[in-house]
Amino acid sequence: MDGKRKHIMTQLPDTGKVTLKTFAGKHKYLTGAGCVLSGISAVISLVPYLCMWKVIKLAVLNWPEGPDGGMLVYWGWMAVASSLFSMLIYFGALMCTHISAFRTARNMKTVALHHLTELPIGYFKGTGSGKLRRIIDDGAGQTETYLAHQLPDLAGALVTPAAVLVLLLVFDWRFGLISLIPMAAGAFFLSRMMGTGMAECMRQYQNALEDMNNEAVEYVRGIPVVKTFQQSIFSFKSFHDSIMRYKDWAVNYTLSLRIPMCCYSVSINGIFAVLIPAGLLLAGDAARGEAYVTTVLDLVFYILFTPVCVTMMDKIMWTSENTVAANDALERILNIIREKPLPEPAVPRKPENHRIEIKDVSFSYNKDGVNALDHVSLTVPQGATAAMVGASGSGKTTLVSLIPRFFDVDRGSICIGGVDVRDMGTKELMKQVSFVFQDSRLFKDSLLNNIRAARPKADKEEVMRAVKAARCEDIIEKMPQGLDTVVGTKGVYLSGGEMQRIALARAILKDAPIVLLDEATAFADPDNEYLIQQAFEKLVEGKTVIMIAHRLSTVCRADCIFVMEEGRVAEQGNHDELLKARGLYAKMWKDYQTSVEWKVGGMA
């Protein structure tokens, strides 16, 4: 599979080369074989109509004596045999296309998911997991359905009208031309509906649907707030707006198709309105006798066969839309695969120590936008605890996220132990750093495996030592199966503070020399806050620590405090030094003290 992935990745610079056949690999020939078999099946499926016409012809030409019974049996069995043979061939076609479709969908998922593991963590901060799941899972499923069912049906639908047209022109060129006129008009209006603009319409449809789905998830999450404050959907303006945008798109798109759709329907379904009067006219011009009977029989033949063309053209219309949808799904998956991983060094270097140096760093999330960080320089000695404080949007989280290389800096460098993080390689860098974020996530797995994710080879005793160090014993004790309890099933859920303690146990087990902490106690209840603080003290023993602080009470004992403002380091020093400077930090401390002393109603 890795060879297949590399083969696909080498073709990505030329976007025109990557198609569903690329993901199908050697199984693409099965897709072609399935389409050919489907076309053959479609042609053979016309034989029963021909047999039916032969029976009618025998009955008419041999009236009143009656047709030869042997010939009637012959054509009857011919109709049955051709129907069975057509179904058998179609079954073989579906077997081929299903095998190819399953392999194609598997390859699409595997390549995309494997590529996601190589992308920097920063990519996932801007792209929701729900959106990625929908693109990969639903996209692969959509292409699987298209390849397995709709593509062979489309092949049959394209072959059938061609075969029927040949028959129509061979039997009686006059009836053939008359039948061809409304079908040609229908094909013209069909091309107008399914032309080059369909791809853009499908892209807009998927975008509108995606936005509405994302906003729906946020709305569902906010239902407790809606019910508490007796709000309506209109209070969630973004969700309401996304629904309105989707509605507007659907209505406008439908209205844009009403004229060509009506013209197509009238043209295709109007074949009989042209064919029958023309047939009666031609029959009337024929002399009474064999020519008259032959003309009427030819008319019957065309009445039997032209509905097949109508049905097939309708199928072409619907499968053409599915073709556009499958191509759009493929393009969305390719957009993920085209995301470039951060470059890895040919020979990774190891840091000499755990001193962190940030040298003249500038960074922007949008390369054409305003810098989130602007010429930032600072140093955190090995074993020191540094705190980042500042208003929301000042650049604290951005700066910390650059240290483990969630993103690459636009300018300057970040070094650990004298080695640029870009020269360390992802594996070595991840060995050096542990993370504890506010929104710590747990897998739907046992607590043991959740903690052991930091070090998969750790034994149960090592995990238990980390559990005790993180003050998680009470969590484990109340679980039905202890460490083997699966989180997120059968009513087993953890509070936010408990999840933070499990995350701390995970970080303690990893025992990395550098700890990056987004203050874990900001939203914890008092009991959990006390336990988290104890676990935190155990975690940071002898480590180089950088903490994003949301409450100034947690930074008083930090060795160095960096005050961020508009993407720059406005002040730095320890707590006492910054208070004496009477600058931004002193003002923030004063405001914090005022908020702590504030009581409801102004009462002490």
Task: Indicate where each model-derived feature is located.
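Membrane-integrated ABC transporters
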Residues: M1-S45, P64-W75, A93, T97, ...
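Short intracellular "coupling" helices and adjacent cytoplasmic loop segments at the cytosolic face
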Residues: D2-Q11, F102, V111-A140, E215-S238, ...
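An intracellular "coupling" helix at the cytosolic face of ABC transporter transmembrane type-1 domains
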Residues: K21, G25-Y29, I121, D138-L147, ...
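Transmembrane-helix motif of ABC transporter permease domains
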Residues: Y29-P48, L61-A105, T294-L304, T311-M312
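A hydrophobic transmembrane-helix motif
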Residues: V43-K54, F85-L88, P152-G195, Y253-F301, ...
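Cytoplasmic juxtamembrane "membrane-exit" helices immediately C-terminal to transmembrane segments
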Residues: M95-R103, N107, R192-D211, S320
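Cytosolic ends of transmembrane helices, especially the final helix of ABC transmembrane type-1 domains
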Residues: Q231, L255-R258, V308-I336
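ABC-type nucleotide-binding domain
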Residues: E352-A604
